[in-house]
Amino acid sequence: YIKLKNTYENYLFSCNYKEAKKTISKIEDKVGISLWSCGQKLILAEQEKGLEGNKRLLSQYLEVASKNRVLSALLEFFSYRAEEGTSLNNYNEKVDKFLKNFEEDEITFHYFSYKLQLQKIDFEDDMKYIFQIDCQFSAIDMYNSFIEVLQRAFANEIKVDELIWDRIKRVSFLIDDFRMNNLLAFRGEKVHPALKKNV
């Protein structure tokens, strides 16, 4: 997944949408459909076919996800975020309005704040909410959330248990992910020699 994801992002950033779509299809064939891959397809639909293509694909997703309120909401916001005409202010206003529906529901409020606003999180408290809801999605989504939570914790100087860092070091020998390697390098950890080129 990581190698294909890097390949996909290279195609996306170079505006080679045809190859980007092929790579997303390869990822889904090899490791399954994920919330991440659906979000990327919405971006590609917007770039290739404009707003109409974006909304057509969203409509197809919502038909399948109609009984899952969390999934439907995330897909709608991913679609909105992919729109070329969406400003950051408009996006944040829409998210703030949406979050008001969950002010009495701490778990859902924190989860959507994390997923939609990329807010600073309290590592100890919010991590359990994030993974509690993310566990209904794919392994890719769980993995991405884990890395993102660690990145934000590190950036905001939130202490992360040494046991977690030890596990990350072990995993870094198996998974060639530059995000994980960078976290270890910034901590002053020795990165596995075979992976140094990605730091």
Task: State what each model feature region is.
Residues 2-3, 36, 69-74, 108:
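Start-of-helix register in tetratricopeptide repeats
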